[in-house]
């Protein structure tokens, strides 16, 4: 099996991932877990040898139980931050993410729970873009309210 695109670099980590934008009735499908006090997009790391498109289709299926098609690439996000997970606590992480709008089937009924690579339980949650809940990426709130066909690039640097 191919390894995740997560590479140790000097004192930090390079992480290449994909995220899904799954919208229905003005809400976005997000993921939470037992350890985090925030929500994040459906998605995960690209595996070596996989394209970003292949990765998002696989990740959406793993987390929702539904095979979905890609609509279009929406955002590229570069993010420098310090890890908060026990495996990367305090390490500088440079994460490059590709966020894809997905074609949501009319009968879309995702599973409610999945598991992370370390067997932590994850849960799916439909969230209004106006909800005052902490979610990442932070630009989703504003950008998804005013969608365009243009691919946008964002940089967040917490160094």
PLM feature spans:
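Acidic, metal-coordinating catalytic segment for phosphate/diphosphate chemistry
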Residues: 1-19, 25, 89-90
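A generic structural micro-feature
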Residues: 12-14, 88-96, 116-121
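A structural signal for short, well-ordered beta-strand segments
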Residues: 20, 73, 98-102
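Conserved hydrophobic "DFG−1" position in protein kinase catalytic cores
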Residues: 22-23, 30, 102, 126
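Conserved Nudix-box catalytic region and its N-terminal flanking loop in Nudix hydrolases
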Residues: 24-63
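A short coil-to-beta-strand element that immediately follows conserved catalytic motifs
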Residues: 67-76
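Active-site-adjacent beta-strand/loop module that shapes the phosphate/pyrophosphate-binding cleft
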Residues: 81-111
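NUDIX/MutT-family hydrolases
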Residues: 101, 113-146
